[in-house]
């Protein structure tokens, strides 16, 4: 089957309210204008001395071998701020289906560990599309408001443990 590009409009970061990656209470990171997923492998290198064909030590150095060590991941989003939204709290009677800036800031201040998902928005509604999930904390959140511009925010989730594939 040929590869088909996914529209960036369909991909989002979703947060699981029950602080674990169970997928029971997914809410979109709200008013986002962009999002990204980053995965890193630390590399471990070993250097060995080379031997010439005659069994003597080579004078031109050796060989460097590398392998993957520890891994880490993070997710980030940029979005628009809605400071008037007081009811984007977890479990509130009028809670929205999104985590707005207020709620993200509350999670950052509390150091809340959350389940985090990077996937097609239709997958959060039950369609089986590939994505990625893990647990994370909000590492940083920043808001800015310029003259004659919309107030914006940037949030970064730092992974805690392994990142898993959603099949």
Predicted regions and their residues:
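Short, compositionally biased strand/turn segments
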Residues: 1, 10, 14-18, 109-121
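Short, surface-exposed loop and linker segments with low hydrophobicity and enrichment for Pro/Ser/Thr
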Residues: 1-6, 63-70, 97-113
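Solvent-exposed edge beta-strands and adjacent loop segments
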Residues: 2-83, 131-151
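Residues within well-ordered beta-strands of beta-sheet-rich folds
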Residues: 76-78, 115-117, 156-158
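Short, acidic/charged, Gly/Pro-enriched secondary-structure junctions
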Residues: 81, 89-135
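Short leucine-rich amphipathic alpha-helical surface patches
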Residues: 118-120, 142, 161
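Short solvent-exposed strand/turn elements
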Residues: 151-166
């Amino acid at each position: 089957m040929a590869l088909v590009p996914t529209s960036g409009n369909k991909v989002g970061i979703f947060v699981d309210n029950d602080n674990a990656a169970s997928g029971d209470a997914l809410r979109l990171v709200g008013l986002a204008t962009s999002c990204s997923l980053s995965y890193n492998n630390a590399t471990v290198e070993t250097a060995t001395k080379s031997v010439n064909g005659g069994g003597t030590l080579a004078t031109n150095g050796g060989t460097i071998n590398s392998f993957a060590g520890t891994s880490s991941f993070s997710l980030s989003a940029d979005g628009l701020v809605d400071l008037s939204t007081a009811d984007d709290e977890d479990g509130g009677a009028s809670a929205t289906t999104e985590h707005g800036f207020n709620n993200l800031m509350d999670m950052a201040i509390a150091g809340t560990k959350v389940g985090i998902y990077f996937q097609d928005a239709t997958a959060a509604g039950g369609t089986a599309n590939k994505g990625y999930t893990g647990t994370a904390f909000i590492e940083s959140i920043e808001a800015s408001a310029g003259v004659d511009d919309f107030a914006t925010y940037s949030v970064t989730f730092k992974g805690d443990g392994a990142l898993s594939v959603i099949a």
